[in-house]
């Protein structure tokens, strides 16, 4: 059965399906939208008591529901100055060292940081000998992404690609999954060196949004697009630890890359299969 599910993913018109779902998710369809939201809540056992707006009828579009805000007191940001915070609600897929430029995906599968970052050798070299963490956001999860550490945006890259599902089954069976799916790469300058936040698209992920640019919608085709940002002056984009940096309009995965000697150790419970909650301790910074 698993092999059939994987084979179907290769065969399905994933981009067409994602565009179709995206149009509905953005539509104000009244009672139809509310009915779909209620079904989704029941199907995925979503705890709406955590939402700032718990009533399904309050959301005009499915996207508004899916990217709903939570009550801030439910996700306090860890205050230790030498500790990064979890950026999302989700589950750890993998984490560990970047070895010879390779990132572990699942048993028998890895991919390179260069491929993940859109083929840019210079960007990839900044993370040689560093660490990575991959976190999967299930449909039931809160889908806003937050900063694990204070950082100033220096570059954003859009990388076109496939739209395979990014669930654990697919990660175990599709080679180089996160380096072949459509994705947005944001590189920040932090007190412990560069941080890459890679927002990976997936089947039915209608779009990826960042705080500074809105929905990332480059022209179609296979070209990689990059934007450089000033790191000083009034136009610099600096986000504090715990600040929102982006959203998935339908769920996916975030891959984070850290420079060599940025992380001393991951926090307790940060290991494959473990649940994450935004704001909780994520990794201890190495003394600089």
Swiss-Prot record:
Cofactor dependency: pyruvate
Cofactor note as given: Binds 1 pyruvoyl group covalently per subunit.
Membrane topology qualifier: Peripheral membrane protein
Location relative to the cell: Cell membrane
Keyword tags: Cell membrane, Decarboxylase, Lipid biosynthesis, Lipid metabolism, Lyase, Membrane, Phospholipid biosynthesis, Phospholipid metabolism, Pyruvate, Zymogen
Post-translational modification: Is synthesized initially as an inactive proenzyme. Formation of the active enzyme involves a self-maturation process in which the active site pyruvoyl group is generated from an internal serine residue via an autocatalytic post-translational modification. Two non-identical subunits are generated from the proenzyme in this reaction, and the pyruvate is formed at the N-terminus of the alpha chain, which is derived from the carboxyl end of the proenzyme.
Site (Cleavage (non-hydrolytic)): 251-252
NCBIfam families, A to Z: PS_decarb (TIGR00163)
Record note on quaternary structure: Heterodimer of a large membrane-associated beta subunit and a small pyruvoyl-containing alpha subunit.
Family assignment from sequence similarity: Belongs to the phosphatidylserine decarboxylase family. PSD-B subfamily. Prokaryotic type I sub-subfamily.
Name this polypeptide is given: Phosphatidylserine decarboxylase proenzyme
């Amino acid at each position: 059965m698993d092999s059939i599910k994987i084979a179907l993913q290769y065969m399905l018109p994933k981009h067409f399906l994602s565009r179709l779902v995206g149009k509905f998710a953005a539509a104000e369809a009244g009672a139809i939208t509310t009915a779909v939201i209620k079904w989704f809540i029941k199907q995925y056992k979503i705890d709406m008591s955590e939402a700032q707006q718990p009533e399904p009828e309050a959301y005009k579009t499915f996207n508004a529901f899916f990217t709903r805000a939570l009550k801030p007191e439910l996700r306090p940001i860890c205050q230790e100055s030498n500790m990064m915070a979890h950026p999302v609600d989700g589950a750890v897929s993998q984490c560990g060292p970047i070895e010879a430029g390779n990132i572990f995906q699942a048993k028998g599968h890895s991919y390179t940081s260069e491929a993940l970052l859109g083929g840019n050798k210079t960007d990839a070299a900044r993370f040689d000998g560093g660490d990575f963490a991959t976190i999967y956001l299930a449909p039931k999860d809160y889908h806003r992404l937050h900063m694990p550490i204070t950082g100033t945006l220096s570059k954003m890259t859009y990388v076109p690609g496939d739209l395979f599902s990014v669930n654990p089954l697919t990660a175990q069976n599709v080679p180089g999954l996160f380096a072949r799916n459509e994705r947005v790469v944001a590189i920040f300058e932090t007190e412990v060196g560069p941080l890459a936040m890679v927002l990976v698209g997936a089947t039915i992920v209608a779009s990826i949004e960042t705080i500074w640019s809105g929905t990332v919608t480059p022209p179609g085709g296979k070209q990689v697009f990059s934007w450089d940002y000033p790191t000083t002056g009034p136009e610099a984009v600096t986000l504090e630890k715990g600040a929102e940096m982006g959203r998935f309009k339908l769920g996916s995965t975030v891959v984070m890359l850290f420079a060599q000697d940025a992380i001393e150790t991951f926090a307790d419970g940060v290991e494959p299969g473990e649940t994450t909650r935004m704001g909780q301790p994520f990794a201890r910074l190495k003394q600089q």
